[in-house]
Amino acid sequence: MKITNITTYRLPPRWMFLKIETDEGVVGWGEPVIEGRARTVEAAVHELKEYLIGQDPARINDLWQVMYRAGFYRGGPILMSAIAGIDQALWDIKGKVLNAPVWQLMGGLVRDKIKAYSWVGGDRPAEVIDGIKTLRNIGFDTFKLNGCEEMGVIDNSRAVDKAVNTVAQIREAFGNEIEFGLDFHGRVSAPMAKVLIKELEQYRPLFIEEPVLAEQAEYYPKLAAQTHIPIAAGERMFSRFEFKRVLEAGGLAILQPDLSHAGGITECYKIAGMAEAYDVALAPHCPLGPIALAACLHVDFVSRNAVFQEQSMGIHYNKGAELLDFVKNKEDFNMEGGFFKPLTKPGLGVEIDEAKVIELSKNAPDWRNPLWRHEDGSVAEW
């Protein structure tokens, strides 16, 4: 079997799919994207395509190593996202050829179901509460919320009180009927993260995510030492080599590699194994589309340390398309009691509505995250 073509489709709301075709008619789908840099990742995919045409798609490990190591410069969000989507599609092809789901090819199940959680947007407490109520009606009881808005390097007590008040109102509205993590998005400095974490402890969040940027990872063990709340991070780390450093340093209780950013299934399964050796949990980052989610689920179901899975159903970014709009077998993604079950169809287990993909790719938006500025005019972290 040989690879004959690779096609990319930029899609609403902020996704990109790729299709790998073979000379035997077997097709694989992947999802390579950096939100806000889809065109750049697309260019990287087509650079890699030049080598991949004519290659055997069954040699996933060798193709991964060529894509990563054959160039003198490597790593980073763009290249690793391009590799990720290609890797997903190669696993999809292998599963279809062997008539088995990917998790079966990776050694079989270690669990029967995985807890799902949903991201809830909104800047005001009432908006967040309404969003949680809506998602509870479709089966969710675990969520992730913004921990704060933009914050100065050293900010005032009013900014701290605003962030704390939002979380307080949510806990008061739902008590212990729900669980939630708080995502700081790396928006705050280490000094302000210390203040916020201390103030938020009383509301017992499930975890604190990206209290500081990955570039400031040396602060993770320092922040972890001051709190009992688990610290999570990893969506902006792109290979096992970056995760190696944070695991050695300690501090993180949960790793959150993104299967569409960190080298795909092949790389993230290795990251999961590294995390298990350090007694660190796995919770793959996934505010993206159905192919990325399927890839995450296959890794979850073969990784003992996987604890829950993010998904984007109903997320506020989804303007123009919802999570399953491009999927024919929607029923396979149904949750039971807030849990996903294993996907059982061959490959990734996602049947893509290709006609719809082609149609909506014709006028896909070029999504960009907003530009935020502080009161003094300096650029703020989004």
Swiss-Prot record:
Record has Flavoprotein as a keyword: no
GO BP field: amino acid catabolic process; D-galactonate catabolic process
Superkingdom as given in the UniProt entry: Bacteria
Enzyme Commission no: 4.2.1.6
Feature type site, description Transition state stabilizer: E310
One example GO MF annotation: magnesium ion binding
Active site: H185, H285
Enzyme class of the recorded protein, top EC level: lyase
Keywords of the record: Lyase, Magnesium, Metal-binding
Further comment found in the protein's record: Reaction proceeds via an anti dehydration.
Task performed by this protein: Catalyzes the dehydration of D-galactonate to 2-keto-3-deoxy-D-galactonate.
Protein name: D-galactonate dehydratase
Source organism of this protein record: Enterobacter sp. (strain 638)
Gene field: dgoD
